[in-house]
């Protein structure tokens, strides 16, 4: 008897304080685009409008939704995919025990109950990628959906995808995903990595981490599982994921050959690509730029090759003294990708793992190859984004962005940070968010989060929260710096609430309302403190904002401009000082 992953075992449903789920009707029947609406209280009887913000949480924050993990979440894209008439259902490959890294299927593994569903693929001769549609002048339902989320015209979305400046990762076998876009002319996105390892985590925990990450604002999820039950864990995640899901297929392929890199073959890897594409993975990290001739260059590095995928392929290349089979079979990979609309995330297997190695010959040699591969993928109308570093000091960050835009013809950049210093284990979410904010400002389209556990261990649920929030700050700061037309609205609303001492509105408008309230209540827990005109930092006498209010009130009472009120008040105080005898200490 197979076990099940019960929703009661883990925390899935939740909402953020002062918020409600709302839906914007799209141009097609039944299209409903989710937003989160943050209510605000009045200011002296004058209403403050609610603020609508981008929402990644899926149905889990909808009070009307009943969580049934065994059924998966709704599939808003299913009718759109079938309606285009260019896909077919087929039997698909047989799921084998080795897909989960075992010789014999375990009775205790909670297999997803709808494993008998038939996958979809493109009909013979068809190409079902969003890039293919865009290049043929077609605005898809997914593009219309994205346009509403981003506050732009559908034609702008189509053009950005057609020209390769943005990707809309949307595997036809992941109809549960709410369409989103990754490109430098849209909101900066954040990816959260989850996944088990050989020594830690369960299927239930990974499903919970996925919903937890999206609750806090993760735009995509990467399942980087390397332990047992890789296939089954991924199935549970995808069927319940409202955001695109990415993977690094070489990890699972390695498990299929018992962890021995030199035993990898193109056939095993190809089978793994098809397996994951049939499940609904939206983008693959593929380390096709780690070429045999680049590997010796890394020998003089401080930290060598730090990418798991990069080191696996380097080991294979050296053992066989052959060129990377991901590079030599790249056209065949493109043929698979366009049958399912899986996007490339071209991996930076030679990224620097220390600031000493930043912007070195190995890193930029690989980038040149990724530019070459981008052109090949685009020839097949397959969507591409480029992965970037890594560890880079602040003064070298801009060069990375400029080179990527030039060499990779403007394809979206997707970076891990970068970390701006190597001396802060336990705080690498901060060292990397500094670099992430900078490179996001310069044009990076998506930031891969870093948690406090980076370099130390597998992140838990709280680490995921910290990592996502830290990177939402970096992404939002970049949006502000780039002048995104709606980015400042939430900042302005929170600043107004702060100045008016609307404490609950301050909490609710923040990226992490619960943490903000928790910190406030540590020193001022009483309910009355939620309306007080001070906090515990300065107290009632020294609150700068309360003093500002007093100045404004004084100006109003004396029919003065604020600057005049300050001058008048200063003169009055000067006279008081003279009348008291002009003594410094009374």
Curated annotation (Swiss-Prot):
Binds 1 [4Fe-4S] cluster per subunit. The cluster is coordinated with 3 cysteines and an exchangeable S-adenosyl-L-methionine. One of its GO terms (cellular component) is cytosol. GO terms for molecular function: 4 iron, 4 sulfur cluster binding; carbon-carbon lyase activity; zinc ion binding. Pfam families: ThiC-associated, ThiC_Rad_SAM. Substrate binds at residues 193, 222, 251, 287, 307-309, 348-351, 387, 414. Residues 1-59 are annotated as: Disordered. It catalyses: 5-amino-1-(5-phospho-beta-D-ribosyl)imidazole + S-adenosyl-L-methionine = 4-amino-2-methyl-5-(phosphooxymethyl)pyrimidine + CO + 5'-deoxyadenosine + formate + L-methionine + 3 H(+). [4Fe-4S] cluster binds at residues 535, 538, 543. Keywords: 4Fe-4S, Iron, Iron-sulfur, Lyase, Metal-binding, S-adenosyl-L-methionine, Thiamine biosynthesis, Zinc. Pathway: Cofactor biosynthesis; thiamine diphosphate biosynthesis. Its EC number is 4.1.99.17. One of its GO terms (biological process) is thiamine diphosphate biosynthetic process. The keyword Metal-binding applies. Its cofactor is [4Fe-4S] cluster. Residues 22-39 have a biased composition (Basic and acidic residues). Zn(2+) binds at residues 391, 455. InterPro entries: ThiC, ThiC-associated_dom, ThiC/Bza_core_dom, ThiC/BzaA/B. Catalyzes the synthesis of the hydroxymethylpyrimidine phosphate (HMP-P) moiety of thiamine from aminoimidazole ribotide (AIR) in a radical S-adenosyl-L-methionine (SAM)-dependent reaction. Belongs to the ThiC family. This is Phosphomethylpyrimidine synthase. It comes from Bacillus cereus (strain ATCC 14579 / DSM 31 / CCUG 7414 / JCM 2152 / NBRC 15305 / NCIMB 9373 / NCTC 2599 / NRRL B-3711).
